Amino acid sequence: MKDDFIMFPKVDFAFKEIMRNETVRKGFLSAVLRIKDTDIKSVVILNTNLPKVHSDEKQGILDVRLTMNDNTEIDIEMQVCSMKTWAERSVFYVSKMISEQTHINKMYSNMKKCINISILNFNFTDKTKRFNTTYHICEDTEHFKYTDIAEWHVVELPKLPEVSDGTDIYDWAKFIKSEKREDFEMLAKKNNYLKEAYNQLDIISQDEQKRLEYTARQKALYDYNELMHENYTSGYEKGVAEGKAEGISEGVLKEKTRLAKELLKMKSMTLESIAKCTGLSVEELNALTLA
């Protein structure tokens, strides 16, 4: 019997399962890249097997690698855990996608365009309030493209406004961010691509084996977030404690120095007596007399 359980698309396991559907891939890319769906002739998924062990699994990264129209390679990454070096990481992977082509194509003119699409469940930049941004390699002054070989698209889910801006990418971001079946049903009425995405999500949500894998993945991401939070909290508390101790130590030293200076001015006590009284060494007292 069908229950009301529904997976969250922002959990990368669920997102990747949805992307196995070619119709969904076509609709998603049309929205993100802002191109006509009729211009997308084919979208072939390259890494068809979801890895059991992934080099970035602890950081919550699973990607979908595609080739579009046989002339463009696309890497879609869903990142649920905050990462300060995301820009550098995405540049590295696009560079890797480009360099991998040299093993096949010896002519630079034959290299495919490489695109990274990052769907982030954290704020990537504070330089703009827009939830969707696009980046190229451009000339500094007039901003024309140096090359069209590389391109980056970033979708920041936390920045998604409540009111739609009327774009297809807004509807897709809303779909990925949603957690309630009624929200998915509403979005499915927007267009056939989102309808297909919801149908696919519903199918995998009722698959017992996929549900087990989804739950395991969700737990792994939760555990990672908890570990990062604990490390941050313990590090912060340790820093505060060390700061307090250092502050107290500096305060005591300043008071000893002040007292020593007063006693030295009086010239009624020997250096040895002042040293015993203040806890400073004779050498330190001599330094004060020369200061």
Where are these regions (language model features)?
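Short, charged alpha-helical interaction segments and adjacent helix-coil junctions
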Residues: 2-5, 9, 74-79, 174-291
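Conserved single-residue anchors adjacent to enzymatic active/cofactor-binding motifs
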Residues: 1-211
